[in-house]
């Protein structure tokens, strides 16, 4: 049986490399329920992907804007909740410190 950390490392890898609408939803759910912080998720991603780069990841988070609200609805996410999702993802992005980004 997989440990939750292993599952979340895979979810972070998916968000980092594929960045599909469902990948944003998976990470948002893990953070929203309080099980993980973005910092912990990045640590997990770094354990499975030696090339994981927080600066690239932070920049990649803006790609959420390429999805229409309806694309999130395919996964049972209410369209009315999408603006709040986008705001949370923006907060993740600005939440990285210069030290975490290698600046």
Feature roles, as predicted:
Residues 1-103:
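Compositionally biased terminal segments of proteins
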